[in-house]
Amino acid sequence: MAFRSNAALCGAVLVLAVSVTAARSGAVDSSAVLDAASGDAIVGAASMYNPFRPGWREGGPNTASGERYDPSVWAAAIKTSLREKFGGVQYGAKPTYALVEAVGKKVIVKINDVGPLTPGRIIDFNERTMRLFDPSLERGVIHGVSVTPLSGDWIPGPVG
């Protein structure tokens, strides 16, 4: 009898975990995001950075916010000269978020770093974010990217 109870409990926990994960991974409603836009959009080019790839000269293992660079989250580095428009990204500060739009797709990213080191770019995506816009990572640069600061706290990810 104890085995049945433990199995039932494990099953219930598994179902709950899957439900929560599915709910969090769903796209955010576009109208809610547009209501939170807290500034004019900046339009320009974007590229990708990953300080752990051999030969990359950009950044280091830690971001400007103090977080370790993680290629698997929805994050980006905003151009240093735009730092104040995006909440003054700095070590230990509360993260800020932005709505990024390009090639017919939208995503909320956490702005946790500054850069890009490449002239002419307004934002550098980490690997996960870049894969949304360029799944093969072959483009290298995406032009016509719109980046809008968001007020408040957000769960980063695609916007539907």
Question: How should these model regions be labeled?
Answer:
Residues A23-G160:
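Secreted/periplasmic proteins
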Residues C10-S19:
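Bacterial N-terminal signal peptides
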Residues M1-C10:
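Bacterial N-terminal signal peptides that target proteins for export
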